[in-house]
Amino acid sequence: MQDSLGDRIKRYEECSNYKFTNRVPIIIRIDGKAFHSWTKKTKCVKPFDSNLINLMSNTTKYLCENISGCICGYCQSDEISLCLINSQNNETQPWFDNRIQKMVSVSASLATYYFNSNNMFEHKCPALFDSRAFVVPEKDIINYFIWRQRDASRNSISMLAQSMYSNKNLLKKTSDEKIQMCKDKGVDWNNLPNHFKYGSFVYRNQSNEPLVNKITGEISYRKHFIIDQNINVFEYKPECIINTILIENNIKLF
């Protein structure tokens, strides 16, 4: 018996079931919802809370490990950026067949689940995350991460300055002026740990543990996602860590 009602409703769904073009790089950006209020409720340390930074970094790593095609992730403040590639070979299948609604809803759910499950703050408060996804040309992948890292540094400078000065004193001040004002108080932003200034980067790194093929005897090394909290400024040089990852995945940089 034909289900005419069900077929009609499914056609409504299909109208908004958009998909990204296959074999094109995808960026997923996940943001904490109202984290300014959340950090107050959980009594996070100002200007930088190492527990929150580590939790966000580990959440990024969890997403990289559980999202098919993800080659790297970048974390700064309450924001996570992921790069997905599904063009490694002709058999590569995109995550959820590149269905946009699935990608944004599940990535936000994964972030929310892991973050709240591993929240060790004394003052508990559930966190929520939203997500967006879009495609970028291969040559603009590095530009995207440069853009987000610049925002990270700008926010880092402002957070440090706000811990020492009132909003009135900081009004219309440039980042360089804020750095100097912090120096006047005895704190040099340039000397802070790199992950306070530039964020954290998650990528696959080759393990030292060998894997031996029982049939051929060939030795290979498994790659695991690691968290790098000592990154420097992203730049257009092959030796830059993000460029190294893109080159390994056959992405054209320039």
What are these regions (language model features)?
Residues M1-F254:
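Regulatory and interdomain segments flanking nucleotide-handling catalytic cores
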